[in-house]
């Protein structure tokens, strides 16, 4: 019996990191399993502790040409003094999982024709095994080309900073022009990992994965030419860069079979078209109690309808990733009387809501977002303009791209935050009114719809992303018969 042609995938620990892998695999298999070679995808999941119920639900719903294996869980004893920041922590979990991953790949090669290993950016250490098994090393880069461009440039920028005596990466007073990027950045808007001391574990972990990125065979990019074509082209022209394959947008097609039965979706059914501001900060992002209060007061004062997915606050903005958070009722942190005063104006949903269905709903008029790349792609493909309130990682770069170049977002004006970095209630009101009421908001909405149309064209037959996916499949197909 002829062996299946297999693609192995290694996401990072965490529910939010798994979704792009599942959606990419579904798209790839649907696109390419009618060309004489039948691909199969196996997802090998590194874990720390028991997988979440949401992770298990996603994996149990995989189609028949996909399967998964949980690698043995890494225990706290193995971690010794575990890093508190999620980036070095994820990197360490993957490193400790390498022996188990090697066993899993050995098993796959005995049963299938294994042609590629696809990792997350922060699972890139797993690609050390690709050469050992003589297969393609690939990174599924779930952020955009602008972020990728910075990641590829970062080792050189770091080297140029070797003469700095104060442990700072860059001159904080000057804008930064990253080679290949179509927009300049303030230093504060670059990924927050570079703002750690250069001697820190967080900085070193990020530098290590950026150095490894230039050595992989293929970077699969969740973007498309109409969105970031100039930057994609700049990377593709670099002789030292890996082969870049822009196949986006990759988004979830639905949040779950029960989504339309939820109260928040039923509530949307009773709201006027384009009237509701949706607020959510991603699967792992959190805001401080002070910022939560300012947003709440701003929403109330704006008078606009809102649907707010609320989690307990934290001073650590990335606290939802790999860190055990409190199980408090998030509604308890709202200002006194807020829910009663806004009963006819908005709805607050604790912890989770079906984002795809909300963004696709005709009543949703704008999205106050942390500017995580996946959430932004979901917003753009559904034609929903963004209010940018970035929290961490590359989100400030994304916010700059969306506001300054792509014009699909508005952001509280520079200087609108107070001395503690909090965007005040007055500024929340101001930016809500700009996007929901002004001519400026209408222009942003129009531009978002244009990019939505371009996104659908990119993934259609013979679109730019469709053709890029075909090119990738051909590489893997030829490997299977080599």
Task: Give the role of each language-model region.
Residues 1-276, 280-482:
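Glycosyltransferase specificity loop/lid
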